[in-house]
Amino acid sequence: MAASTMAISSTAMAGTPIKVGSFGEGRITMRKTVGKPKVAASGSPWYGPDRVKYLGPFSGEPPSYLTGEFPGDYGWDTAGLSADPETFAKNRELEVIHSRWAMLGALGCVFPELLSRNGVKFGEAVWFKAGSQIFSEGGLDYLGNPSLIHAQSILAIWACQVVLMGAVEGYRIAGGPLGEVVDPLYPGGSFDPLGLADDPEAFAELKVKELKNGRLAMFSMFGFFVQAIVTGKGPLENLADHIADPVNNNAWAYATNFVPGN
């Protein structure tokens, strides 16, 4: 068995299915799904040692393990969360996935309220109140139209979400009948029907744009949560109130409501 082993370069063959010759009657198949990203264009301002830093020219020297190899690396890690390579890889995946969910969630929080304020009838357009409509006598009608999806069972909705989301996540990680997945973070193939990742340089820049917008969306969702708790209103209604009376409708004014004695 020792004579049959071979040295495999993870950088040269990352993401490539590898078959190693038979050992007796068995066969070993290995598929490395997470490897180093393709090197971006040398002139890109987002990668490499001369990339944009979190404080621009005042950033100082970044940690040695933040080399500008991955998208969204601004050389800032004061807590040392990326020092361990395995933890870094896990956190990268968590950030990308949470960014995508946050972008979808932020759109889902704002868009129904926007439609409602422009004449589209909803049972409840405010994002943190909409789900409770399923417990009402008439149930929950998507877009206020009973001919689309008329939901009356929270268990049925939960089951549908588990099946649909589980199937997509399973394919993203392990592949499926539509093709193999080389990188579970950027599976491509059926997940990229427009071929946006065909050009490596454009793809490298899109990764950065995705993370920048995703980080903004995560902060936005946090703001929506706080607004819902403090004001009991949706994001657009809060925005309209602030524009109408910025002196009395702002974060500082609401924060003083929680000061002892008020």
From Swiss-Prot:
- Which positions does UniProt annotate for chlorophyll b 3 binding? S153, E169
GO terms for CC? Answer: chloroplast thylakoid membrane; photosystem I; photosystem II
UniProt entry keywords in alphabetical sequence? Acetylation, Chlorophyll, Chloroplast, Chromophore, Magnesium, Membrane, Metal-binding, Phosphoprotein, Photosynthesis, Photosystem I, Photosystem II, Plastid, Thylakoid, Transit peptide, Transmembrane, Transmembrane helix
Output the InterPro entries linked to this UniProt entry.
Chloro_AB-bd_pln, Chloroa_b-bind
Binding of chlorophyll b 2: at which residues?
A: R100, I149, L178
Q: How is it modified after translation?
A: Photoregulated by reversible phosphorylation of its threonine residues.
Tell me which residues bear Phosphothreonine: T33
The UniProt record gives the binding positions of chlorophyll b 5 as Q161, F258
Entry keyword annotation includes Membrane? yes
Q: Which Gene3D superfamilies match?
A: Chlorophyll a/b binding protein domain
Please list the residues that make up the transit peptide in this record. 1-30
Record note on cofactor = Binds at least 14 chlorophylls (8 Chl-a and 6 Chl-b) and carotenoids such as lutein and neoxanthin.
List the transmembrane segments: 96-116, 148-168, 216-236
**Membrane topology type:** Multi-pass membrane protein
- Which GO terms fall under molecular function for this chain's record? chlorophyll binding; metal ion binding
State what this protein does. Answer: The light-harvesting complex (LHC) functions as a light receptor, it captures and delivers excitation energy to photosystems with which it is closely associated.
What family name appears in the similarity comment? Belongs to the light-harvesting chlorophyll a/b-binding (LHC) protein family.
Q: Which PANTHER family has this protein been placed in? A: CHLOROPHYLL A/B BINDING PROTEIN
* Descriptive protein name: Chlorophyll a-b binding protein 1, chloroplastic
Q: Which organism is it from?
A: Zea mays
What would be the name of the gene that encodes this protein? CAB1
